[in-house]
Amino acid sequence: MTDLFDYKEFLKTVTSQPGVYRMYDTAGTVIYVGKAKDLKKRLTSYFRAQVANRKTETLVKNIAQIDVTVTHTETEALLLEHNYIKLYQPRYNVLLRDDKSYPLIFLSADEHPRLAVHRGAKHEKGEYFGPFPNSYAVRETLALLQKLFPVRQCENSVYRNRSRPCLQYQIGRCSGPCVEGLVSEEEYQRQVDYVRLFLSGKDQQVLTQLITRMEEASQQLHFEDAARIRDQIQAVRRVTEQQFVSGDSEDLDVIGVAFDAGLACVHVLFIRLGKVLGSRSYFPKVPAGTELSEVVQTFVGQFYLQGSQGRTLPGEILLDFTLTEKDLLASSLSELAGRKIQIQSRPRGDRARYLKLARTNASTALITRLSQQSTIHQRMKELAKVLKLDEINRMECFDISHTMGEQTVASCVVFDANGPVRSEYRRYNISGITPGDDYAAMAQVLKRRYGKALDDQKIPDVIFIDGGKGQLSQAFDVFASLNVPWDKQKPLLVGVAKGSDRKAGLETLFLASEGEGFSLPPDSPALHLIQHIRDDSHNHAITGHRQRRSKVKNTSALEMIEGVGPKRRQVLLKYMGGLQPLFNASVEEIAKVPGISQALAEKIHNALKH
């Protein structure tokens, strides 16, 4: 039992209402979040002579304080619990580590709605459909919709500045609402309605409405309209016949689970509109001694309740595990979605086959991850031995990228005991330095990264600096000047200098800013890990630099041309429909823009091409 916390006095003050509790350690860090229908009964269970499992026993020993939040209902408690878990990331809770938002299809609420890919919070007014397992699935669906229903997909900035229809109109994939007279308001909204129905899985309603319109057009002797609608009907039918994998057009998530060697894999199979769109494997962080039932229960709650703002909830969730709080979770999700959501664990027919597929994928992904972890763990041990450290739990690596000193970007990548932690990768735009001064750039990024308070878990054991003794010397100077509350002596600073011909395996490592460095054998597992984190850092930096350079190039290209002022720039962009069409235009096409002579058109064309 804990000596840190007077639980008897605390329990006297606890109500029997539903609510959420947060447990803290001596450092004031939240170490566990839970919810209960009866707070008093639930919290009392932690302090019995015999606790449920080893994890609970360890947790109780570390409790120094408990805070309680009373809620009106158990459903409210469930939602609050998952919000707190996401906020505090307590170490004794099962944590869903991959919290990247899913791509969705967005149908805007503009006068002439547009279709687009969307990620993240739903700030813009409109309708959201999904989720899709990856951006490829979204792009494929948008391309399909473009062939079936001519609804615009261009950005508003392009749409508002068009004076003539673009190529998409010419090939029949947009009805051209940007130009007055090409499509009636009624017809455009009708196509938007078809998109809405199609994305909601109501293909038959789309076909029924199209058939009715075709017959009406034929009766009124509007044979061209009837033929066009007939072609649209045939296209929709071809798509639905090709892509349905079952007769069910419901939205469905199928969840398979595998568990081995303390690691869990939850594989989610996404079925939208009766089609398998794809899948994704998740590896939640599982505290030692956690039962598999708790892993599944917590994962499902976090996955849908924490991510509900970024994803469309399916009509049904299939599991290969019976949840103890299935009814509570189903009612909470139904309340959130405003419609009934079912959770099933004993499906038949096609659903049973889907579940078997999800389970198989979970097992395969788990075997692969265990194999990768074994390699990473071995490399971590070897690197710790080389650097004379007891263990390495966190490493960070920095690199600088620029072109002739312009658009300088620094990157920081993070590895933990299990390898890359991509959600913590960061880029820093560097400014206020002499162009090309890599030392100053490195000093700036290190000050920005470490010149502030850090959680103990975020302090790296090793910091790799991509560069030789000069870069490492800058790092030592920065750390010497830091005035921070955390132990700045903890990180070991290591310089990684490339070989003379920059070949992998010829790297030199420096642990001090003076003296000779040392090299590791080409087959050293420790060297392979250093190369891995160094290459990730380099790729992250150069990608960020290219994006920044491209953005600057595109926005400043016209401004650099003599004779093209703000008014002419505006006329050019409006007439051509944006910067990209202008880049692709010929001299003759540019010369057609009002106010642009043949000579100026040639100058603009040459400047943009070169």
Swiss-Prot record:
Bilayer-crossing regions: none
Keyword Cytoplasm found: yes
Name under which the protein is recorded: UvrABC system protein C
GO cellular component term of the entry, any: cytoplasm
Organism in which the protein naturally occurs: Yersinia pestis
Pfam families tied to this protein: GIY-YIG, HHH_5, UVR, UvrC_RNaseH, UvrC_RNaseH_dom
Subunit structure: Interacts with UvrB in an incision complex.
NCBIfam families: PRK00558.1-5 (NF001824), uvrC (TIGR00194)
Boundaries of every UVR domain copy: 204-239
Domain GIY-YIG stretches: 16-94
Compartment list: Cytoplasm
Entry similarity comment: Belongs to the UvrC family.
